[in-house]
Design a protein with these regions (language model features):
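Inter-lobe coupling/hinge segments of SF2-like helicase ATPases
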Residues: 1-226
């Protein structure tokens, strides 16, 4: 439910493959999103960026043989966390160091693949060095106090850009947010659950609802390769 008579945000779908072919993609951001971010920040407004994967990269892979690090207990790929250079299972909490070389073929080139909120935050710092950036996910929120501090800073406009996972969708009403970017809609749909499309739509609508909460005119950019 939106505040008063506020209009719903305008939604733009941006093709990541087409943007890359046109040279209109920087890091994990299409030019459309970056242009709208620059405009919003220039007006003194706030931006929220949604990427529903924690860590720096969802997995690491050997560029030679394709080996990936997997949890010995859950058999899921381990997420790479750049801080501490650790591989972490987000299901059971198993942690291990990044191997110096591929355990399978012994080649040293084991590289992070994909991107999570940690990488998004790092890239945003480089693209908008003057902006005040914060991250809201289970790694940055180590306590209720830490959670409250991040929310309070954003609400008081001491933060310009908030990067987060599903935690940023929880019904917050930030008056200063005029733009929401959904960085990778594909990973919401690429789920074996037969209700994946329905749940992806619900989640994207929740995220989109953070834009222009009070005075209308908000915008949402959904990046997808589909």
């Amino acid at each position: 439910e939106r505040y008063g008579d506020a209009r719903p945000p305008e939604i733009f779908v941006s093709d990541t493959i087409r943007a890359a072919k046109r040279g209109e993609r920087h890091a994990h951001f299409n030019k459309l999103l970056l242009d709208k971010m620059e405009a919003a920040l220039g007006r003194g407004e706030q931006v929220m960026l949604f990427q529903n994967r924690r860590g720096f990269a969802p997995y690491v892979e050997c560029s030679e043989c394709g080996w990936t690090a997997r949890c010995p207990h859950c058999n899921v790929t381990l997420t790479y966390h750049k801080g501490g250079r650790k591989l972490v299972c987000h299901y059971c909490g198993h942690t291990e160091d990044v191997p110096a070389k591929c355990p399978s073929c012994k080649v040293t080139d084991v590289v992070p693949m994909g991107f999570g909120t940690e990488k998004v935050e790092e890239e945003i710092f480089k693209i908008f060095p003057e902006a005040r950036v914060a991250r809201l996910d289970r790694d940055s929120v180590t306590s209720e106090k830490a959670f409250s501090a991040i929310i309070a800073d954003f609400e008081a406009r001491r933060t310009d850009i908030l990067v987060g996972t599903q935690m940023i969708t929880k019904g917050f009403d930030f008056a200063g947010v005029s733009l929401v970017g959904i960085l990778n809609a594909d990973n919401l749909l690429n789920n074996p659950d037969f209700r994946a499309a329905e749940r992806a739509f619900q989640l994207m609508m929740q995220v989109a609802g953070r834009a222009g909460r009070r005075d209308g005119g908000g915008e949402v950019v959904i990046q997808t390769s589909e």
